[in-house]
């Protein structure tokens, strides 16, 4: 198990708080002991700590299960916020009109989530670590942005 040299925690002053990945049970994604590290990635992103973000994203790029949980978690939250996944998160062409640019890998995974209400583990194991890293990065950036800006995040 890896840790950072300093902790990141949920901020008390944050107006909107989403259930962190470690406390959310997604029916088609197994819960794991390392899920608390996923929380650290969210908090490091919210704190703007690039060193921790980079280290944790590198770790999760090697872990298809962690990326699976992050992407499904982000898709679940975005679905709740927007009443469904907006085209800007699933259609590569639609992202051109937004400041937030989800990765191509995230868009493809989100499109699957939109169609089926979940993604499958095989979709993550079939991807290269670099693709999993970019999908995880997009997922956590999306949730941190929604926490900060709510529905305006995609359209600022």
Regions picked out by a protein language model, each given a short descriptive name:
Residues 1-156:
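C-terminal-biased regions
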């Amino acid at each position: 198990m890896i840790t950072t040299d300093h902790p990141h925690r949920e901020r008390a002053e944050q107006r909107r708080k989403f259930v962190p990945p470690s406390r959310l049970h997604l029916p088609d994604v197994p819960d794991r002991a390392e899920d608390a590290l996923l929380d650290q990635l969210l908090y490091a992103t919210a704190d703007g700590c690039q060193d921790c973000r980079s280290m944790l994203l590198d770790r999760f790029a090697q872990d298809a299960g962690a990326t699976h949980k992050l992407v499904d978690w982000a898709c679940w939250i975005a679905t709740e916020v927007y009443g469904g996944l907006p085209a800007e998160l699933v259609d590569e062409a639609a992202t051109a009109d937004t400041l937030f640019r989800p990765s191509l890998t995230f868009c493809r995974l989100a499109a699957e989530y939109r169609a089926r209400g979940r993604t499958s583990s095989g979709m993550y194991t079939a991807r290269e670590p670099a693709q999993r890293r970019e999908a995880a990065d997009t997922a956590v950036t999306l949730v941190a942005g929604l926490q900060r800006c709510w529905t305006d995040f995609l359209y600022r």
